C-alpha cells in the first residue's frame, strides 16, 4: 500500500472517531515523533490558532476558578457539556482552576452513577482527566476510585432484564492507573507534569516513564483504532447492560473505511462491509452485551479503553500465539455476534469449529444466535472447497476481480496454521533445496517449463517436442492438499493469481488488490515460513512487473479495458493492438519491420504459436499427459487459434489477423507483439520474456515442501 493510501485509511478512521478518541490517538502518535517534528507541529498549531478568538475565550473560561465555581449552580446536563469543552483547555500549573474541576468531577460522576445517565460523557471526562498533564498522582488516584464505582454500578444492573443497554464501563483503566502510579507524576514521557502534550522540553524528551509502553499509556483504544496505534493488546469485550439513557454521542458499528478494492461485494458472506479493514488485533464495540466475565472494550461514541483481563481468572485464546483465534472477535463483529466474544475466548480453534446448537444452548445462547453461529461455522468449514473452486476458475481464464475479492474477505476469517500428523520423507528430502533456493518469481510447475523448453527448442524448426512431466511436479499438479490445510490451499490460489497477472494484460486494479492481499498474508500467523517466502517472492515479481510498465500504459488502460479482441476468443492473454485501435488515433501510421536484432529462441520459443498450437492439437488425443497441460498452454498460446503471438523466426513483416500492420509506437509499446521490433530504447518485451522464462524455470526447480505449485 502506498503512503498516500495509508494516510487515506488513517484519515478515514480519524474522521469516524469522536473528539476524545482523536485526542488520545494524536497524543499517542506524538510520543513517537522526534524533537524537531514535535517543535514543528507546535509552530504549525500555534500559527493556525493565533486568530481563533472563540478558542481564546473558551480557554480564558476554562482557566478561571470563579467561572468554574459558578457551574455548580447549573443543571447536570449543562455542567457535563461545559466540562467536556473546557477541561481539555486547562493549563498545567493552574492549581486553583484544577481544584475547581476536581470538586465538580466527583459530583457529576456520582450523579451519573446514581441515575445511570451520561455514562459516555462520564467516561470521556475521566479519560481527559487521566491523560491531562495538569493532573497529579493524587488526582488520578481519586479518579480511579470512580472507575471502580462505575464498574460496581453497571455490574449490579447487569442481571436486570427490565433494563436496556448501557455503554461499556472500562475495568482496565484501573489496571493502567496502577502503571501510571509508578511514573512519579510523569505523563507520557514528559518529566514535568506542567508540560503539555505539545510543548516539548528538549532536555527531557527522551525521559520515558517507567511502566508505560513506548513511553505512553493508551488509556483509550477504540474498536476502530488500528493495531499499529494501540500499544496495548486487545482483550475480549464485556458490555454490561443498564438503563437505556445513554449518551446520544454514538457512532456506527465500525468506522473503518472499506478496503481499497472498488465495488467489492460481500461474496459468500464471510465478512460484512464494516469489517473490510486492515488485518490486526481488533477490539469490539458495545452494540450488544456479551455474556462475559472479562474486561470490556470501549463502546462506540466514547472510544473507551482497551484493556487486559486478569490473567489469573480465565483463559483468553484470542491472545494466544498460534491459536488461530485472533481474528475471531472481528469475525463475530462482522456477523453482529460480538456479544458472544467472551464465550469464544475460552475455546480452542478446534472446539469452535465443532460447536453444535446443543452446546450453544447450554451456554444460554439465544435460538437465533445459535442458528447463525452454526451456519457461519459451516461456511468456515467450506472455505477449502471454495478455494478449490476459485483455483479452477482462475485456471480456466476467468476474471480475477471476483477471486481477489473472495480472498480478501477470507483472509479476515479465523485461520489456523496447518499441522501435519507426520512429515513424509519425500517432503523432508525436498525441503533443504527449497530453503536454499527460494523461488523469486511467481511459481509454476515443471510442466509449464518443460512445455516452454520444448517450444523454445522447436522454435527454429517450427515443430513442438512432446513435453515431459516429471513425476514430482506431476504429482504436485494433481494431488490435492490435505483436508484442513487452508493456508496451503490459500497459497496455491495466490500462486495461480500471480501466474495470471504475469501473463495477462496489465490491470493496475488487480495488481494493487493482489499486493494488498499479499501484505496481509505475510503478517498472518497461519502461514508457514516457507509459504511466506514463496508469497514474498511473488510480491517481488508482481512489483517488478508493475514497475516495468510505462506509466502511460497504466493510465491508458481504462480507455480500452472494456473492449475485447474477437481473435482471442475467451483467452485472457495479452490484448492486441487491434483491440484498441479504435480508441487511439492512428496519426502518422508507420510500417514497422523486424530488425536484425533477435531475442534468443530459448526465450521466444515459449510464445511461438503456429507450431505450438498445431502440435498441441496433434498430441492431445493420444497423450493424456498433454491433455492435463491444455490449461497450462492457454497462458502462453491463443486458444482461438489466431496467430496473436507468432514466432520471431522471420525477417520480414507478415500480416496477422490479430495485429494490423499499421500501428502507432504507443500501441507497439503497450502490447509488445513479438513479430514487430520495438525501438532499441524500449526493451520492455525482452525484459518481460526473460523474467517470465526465468520465473518458470526457477519455480520448477524450487517446487517442493508445502505442495503449493501454481499449476
Swiss-Prot record:
Tissues with expression? Expressed in brain (at protein level).
Report whether Repressor shows up as a keyword of the record: yes
Q: Where is the signal peptide?
A: none
Q: Which SMART domains match?
A: SAM
Cross-referenced Gene3D superfamilies: Smaug, PHAT domain (1.25.40.170), Transcription Factor, Ets-1 (1.10.150.50)
Q: Where is the SAM domain?
A: 323-396
GO cellular component, alphabetical, reads: cytosol; dendrite; fibrillar center; synapse
**Keyword tags:** Cell projection, Cytoplasm, Methylation, Phosphoprotein, Repressor, Synapse, Synaptosome, Translation regulation
- Give the span(s) annotated as Disordered: 278-323, 422-448, 565-588
Where Phosphoserine occurs, residue numbers?
168, 420, 573
InterPro entries listed in its UniProt record: PHAT_dom_sf (IPR037093), SAM (IPR001660), SAM/pointed_sf (IPR013761), SMAUG/VTS1_RNA-bind (IPR050897), Smaug_SAM (IPR037634)
Which subcellular locations apply to this protein? Cytoplasm; Cell projection, Dendrite; Synapse, Synaptosome
Q: GO molecular function terms here?
A: RNA binding; translation repressor activity
Positions of modified residues (Omega-N-methylarginine): 566
In terms of Pfam families, this protein maps to: SAM_1, Vts1
Q: Which CDD domains match?
A: SAM_Smaug
The annotated regions of Polar residues compositional bias extend over 568-581
SUPFAM superfamilies per the UniProt record, alphabetical: SAM/Pointed domain
Biological process terms from the Gene Ontology for this record are: positive regulation of translation; regulation of mRNA stability
Carrying Phosphothreonine, the residues are 424
Q: What does this protein do?
A: Acts as a translational repressor of SRE-containing messengers.
Family the UniProt entry places it in: Belongs to the SMAUG family.
What's the name of the protein?
Protein Smaug homolog 1
Q: Please give the organism.
A: Mus musculus
